[in-house]
Amino acid sequence: VSEEDARQLQRGNYDLTFVIADGLSARAVHAHAVPMLDAVLPRLEGWRIAPIVIACQARVALGDEVGERLGSELVSVLIGERPGLSSPDSLGIYLTWQPRIGRVDSERNCLSNIRSPGGLPYELAADRLVWLMKAARGQKLTGVQLKDTGFLPP
């Protein structure tokens, strides 16, 4: 985060911060970030959500610094995944409890291949993400210690 951008991130008392990052596929973010947010936000009634942060040429770890600066309990990074042979536009979501600089990948949960058609549909991804968010708040952790075994698709 640049010094100028850091000044824009006003600390608050937030349950959740969303960071939208182009990552390795701007196409994925352009196609799927808004429909994904449209699916998940109505499921978060009563949550204190920080202003959405949009980042260019960003990686997942940026969410740690953004979430820490904003004083957020959880950060959810929506990011364009590395294009593959069959899917050049998959969106990934990385969820981190108590974001701060220095978090490692094993401290995050990931949903991947979110796209419609052909991947994890937005509504199902939203159900799974909200389940993970609630479980993270209850157990006060994310990552390899937080298993989504309690999630059953409809």
Locate predicted features.
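C-terminal functional extensions of proteins
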Residues: 81-89, 94-154
